[in-house]
C-alpha cells in the first residue's frame, strides 16, 4: 500500500484527522476529529479542483445533471468548526441551503460519495482545502443607526442582524428599538438591498398589550425593554404576557439605577418565564452592580456585548465617554456623571471574562454603535478565548488542542443567538437543511478577515484584489462586495425574520418586498439548558460596596490584559 506523509498530504488536500491548526495568532489550537472527505484509510479519492487534478469530466465530475439532484456548489475538503464538532468534509449547497456534509465526487469512479454530493457539470467548486468553515455569525444586539453597519458586519463574517432603530435618532442611538408599524415597514423596505437576514425589535416598554401586538403584526420578531424607556416590573410582566401569547422573545436591558426595583424585583416580575438578558456583563448597563447574578437562573438567556471583550488595560477608560454619548448624558450634570460611573466597574468586567469561559454567559453580540463595534463580534470573541486560555489553562477535555473551548466560543455567536431568537430552524450552524450562510477563513486570518462570506449559497463578500489586475490577488486586497451583494441577489439569498402573527396578518402581501418573510419558531420554551456548550449556572455574588465578585464562593481577581492577538499585526489603522 503506497504511503504519503502528513506534510505532503496537507499540501495536496489540506490537513486531516489528528492534525492541529492554530487559529490566527492566538494560543488556540484545533484538532480535526474526523475526515469525511478522505484522510487515513480513505486517502486517494479526494475531490480537488485545478489543472491536472480530480474534478474533471468522467473523473471526479459525473455526468449527472441538476435535475438528478446535483448540488449547485461544493466546498471541497474544508475544516468545519461548529458547536457540534470539528471535522473535515466536502460541503454541498443547493437552492441556497446546505444539502450534504461528507464526501463529494463521482460515484461512477469513486467510492463512498455522498448521494447529495455528486458533482455534475452544473456544479460550481469552492476550494476549502486548508481552510476553515464556520456558520455565518448572528449579531443579536444591533442598533440600526446607520446603514453602513451592513458592510462592516458582512465584511467581518456576520450574516444576520437582530436589533432595532430608525437611524441616528436619540431613541435608536440608545435603545435598539424600531417603534411602531410605520417605522418597522420603512426599515424593512430599507433593508432590501443588503445580503443580510434581519430581525427587528419593537418597543416593549408599555403596559398596553395592543401597542405591542400592533408592532408584532407590523414586522417585529420580538420586543425590547430598555431602561431608558422604563424597564419597570409592570412593563416586564406585560411584555412577557404578550410574548407567551405570540411566541416572540423579549430582550431586556434592566434598570441600572434600581429606581423601580432591584435585580430580585426584576426576576420576580419575570416569574420564571424565558427572557434574553442583554448586558449580563460588567459595564453595559442593567441593575448596578449585580446584574450578572442572573446567570444562575434557569430561564434567563444571558448575553454580553463586545466593548468589554476581553477586559484590557484600556477598557474602563474608554467606556466613560462612550456611555455619555450613547445615553444622551451631559458630563456637566453631576447626576449624569454618577449614572455613567456606576456602570463602569473593572471588577465586574474582569468577572465577565471568567463567566464566558465557564459557559455561564451564553451569547456575545455587538451593541453596534451604542458602545459596541459591529465588525468586531467575532474577533473579540476569540480574543477573549485566548486570554482565558492563558490565564486559566485548558478546559476539561482539552489537551493537545482546544476543541472544547473553541466549540464553546463559536456557539456564542452562532447557534445560541439563533436559539434565543427562534431562528435555529433556519440558521446558526453548519448542518444539512439550513440556509447556506457560511464563512470561509484562511487559518492565519481566522476571526479577523474572512476569505469568503457566503450568503444563502452565493458569495456575497470576499477578500479581493485590484479589479483591473490580471489575476484576483494583486494589492490592495480588501473586503469587497461580490455578486451576492448587488442587484436583486440579496432579496433571493436573505430573509426577514418576523413573528408568525405577522405572516398570518398579511404583512408580506402588504409590503410586497422581494426579500422573503420567514416566521420564527416559538422562543417560549427555550431555557439556559438549551444554550449549546454555554449552559453553566454558577452562583454569582457581587458586593454592593466594593463590587468584588465571587463565583461559586471564589473571589475573582480582575486582571486586565495588556496585549492581545488579532490586533495590530493585522491592521494598519
Swiss-Prot record:
Similarity comment text for this entry: Belongs to the metallo-dependent hydrolases superfamily. Urease alpha subunit family.
Gene Ontology terms: cellular component: cytoplasm
PANTHER family with a match to the protein in the record: UREASE
Residues annotated as domain Urease: 136-573
Binding site for substrate: 226
Protein name: Urease subunit alpha 2
Sequence positions bearing N6-carboxylysine: 224
Subunit text: May form a heterohexamer of 3 UreC (alpha) and 3 UreAB (gamma/beta) subunits. May also form a heterotrimer of UreA (gamma), UreB (beta) and UreC (alpha) subunits. Three heterotrimers associate to form the active enzyme.
Residues the record marks as active site: 327 (proton donor)
GO biological process: urea catabolic process
Reaction equation(s) it catalyzes: urea + 2 H2O + H(+) = hydrogencarbonate + 2 NH4(+)
Organism (species): Streptomyces avermitilis (strain ATCC 31267 / DSM 46492 / JCM 5070 / NBRC 14893 / NCIMB 12804 / NRRL 8165 / MA-4680)
GO molecular-function term, one example from the UniProt record: urease activity
Enzyme Commission (EC) number: 3.5.1.5
Domain of life: Bacteria
Biological pathway: Nitrogen metabolism; urea degradation; CO(2) and NH(3) from urea (urease route): step 1/1
Amino acid at each position: 500500500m503506497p504511503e504519503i506523509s502528513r506534510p505532503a498530504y496537507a499540501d495536496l488536500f489540506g490537513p486531516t484527522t489528528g492534525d492541529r491548526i492554530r487559529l490566527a495568532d492566538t494560543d488556540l489550537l484545533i484538532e480535526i476529529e474526523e475526515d469525511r472527505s478522505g484522510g487515513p484509510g480513505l486517502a486517494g479519492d479526494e475531490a480537488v479542483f485545478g489543472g491536472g487534478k480530480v474534478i474533471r469530466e468522467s473523473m471526479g465530475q459525473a455526468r449527472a445533471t441538476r435535475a438528478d439532484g446535483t448540488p449547485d456548489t461544493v466546498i471541497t475538503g474544508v475544516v468545519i468548526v461548529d458547536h457540534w464538532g470539528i471535522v473535515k468534509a466536502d460541503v454541498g449547497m443547493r437552492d441556497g441551503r446546505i444539502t450534504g456534509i461528507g464526501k463529494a465526487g463521482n460515484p461512477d469512479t469513486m467510492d463512498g460519495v455522498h448521494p447529495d454530493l455528486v458533482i455534475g457539470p452544473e456544479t460550481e467548486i469552492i476550494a476549502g482545502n486548508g481552510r476553515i468553515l464556520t456558520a455565518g455569525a448572528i449579531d443579536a444586539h444591533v442598533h440600526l443607526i446607520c446603514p453602513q453597519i451592513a458592510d462592516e458586519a458582512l465584511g467581518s463574517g456576520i450574516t444576520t442582524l437582530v436589533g432595532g432603530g430608525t437611524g441616528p435618532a436619540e431613541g435608536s442611538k440608545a435603545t435598539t428599538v424600531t417603534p411602531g408599524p410605520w417605522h418597522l415597514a420603512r426599515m424593512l423596505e430599507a433593508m432590501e438591498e443588503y445580503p443580510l437576514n434581519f430581525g427587528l425589535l419593537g418597543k416593549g416598554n408599555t403596559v398596553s398589550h395592543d401597542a405591542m401586538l400592533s408592532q408584532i403584526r407590523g414586522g417585529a420578531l420580538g420586543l425590547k425593554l430598555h431602561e431608558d424607556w422604563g424597564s419597570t416590573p409592570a412593563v416586564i410582566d406585560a411584555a412577557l404576557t404578550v410574548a407567551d401569547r405570540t411566541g416572540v422573545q423579549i430582550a431586556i436591558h434592566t434598570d441600572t439605577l434600581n429606581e423601580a426595583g432591584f435585580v430580585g424585583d426584576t426576576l420576580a416580575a419575570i416569574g420564571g418565564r424565558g427572557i434574553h438578558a442583554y448586558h449580563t456583563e460588567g459595564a453595559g448597563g442593567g441593575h448596578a452592580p449585580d446584574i450578572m447574578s442572573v446567570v444562575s437562573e434557569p430561564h434567563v438567556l444571558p448575553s454580553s456585548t463586545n466593548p468589554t471583550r476581553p477586559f484590557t488595560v484600556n477598557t474602563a477608560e474608554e467606556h466613560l465617554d462612550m456611555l455619555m454619548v450613547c445615553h444622551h448624558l451631559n458630563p456637566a450634570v453631576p447626576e449624569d456623571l454618577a449614572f455613567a460611573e456606576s456602570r463602569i466597574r473593572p471588577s465586574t468586567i474582569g468577572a465577565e471574562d471568567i463567566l464566558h469561559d465557564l459557559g455561564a454567559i451564553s451569547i456575545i453580540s455587538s451593541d453596534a454603535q451604542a458602545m459596541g463595534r459591529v465588525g468586531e463580534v467575532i474577533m473579540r470573541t476569540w480574543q477573549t478565548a485566548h486570554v482565558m486560555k492563558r490565564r486559566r489553562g485548558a478546559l476539561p477535555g482539552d489537551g493537545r488542542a482546544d476543541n472544547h473551548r473553541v466549540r464553546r466560543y463559536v456557539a456564542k455567536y452562532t447557534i445560541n443567538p439563533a436559539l434565543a431568537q427562534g431562528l435555529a430552524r433556519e440558521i446558526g450552524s453548519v448542518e444539512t437543511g439550513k440556509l447556506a450562510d457560511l464563512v470561509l477563513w484562511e487559518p492565519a486570518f481566522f476571526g479577523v478577515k474572512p476569505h469568503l462570506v457566503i450568503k444563502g449559497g452565493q458569495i456575497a463578500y470576499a477578500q479581493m484584489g485590484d479589479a483591473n489586475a490580471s489575476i484576483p490577488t494583486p494589492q490592495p486586497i480588501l473586503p469587497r462586495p461580490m455578486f451576492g451583494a448587488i442587484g436583486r441577489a440579496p432579496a433571493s439569498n436573505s430573509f426577514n425574520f418576523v413573528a408568525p402573527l405577522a405572516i398570518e396578518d398579511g404583512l408580506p402581501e402588504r409590503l410586497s418586498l422581494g426579500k422573503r418573510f420567514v416566521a420564527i419558531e416559538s422562543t417560549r420554551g427555550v431555557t439556559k439548558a438549551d444554550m449549546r456548550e454555554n449552559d453553566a449556572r454558577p452562583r454569582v455574588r457581587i458586593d454592593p460596596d466594593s463590587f468584588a465578585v465571587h463565583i461559586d464562593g471564589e473571589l475573582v481577581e480582575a486582571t486586565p490584559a495588556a496585549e492581545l492577538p488579532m490586533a495590530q499585526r493585522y491592521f494598519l489603522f
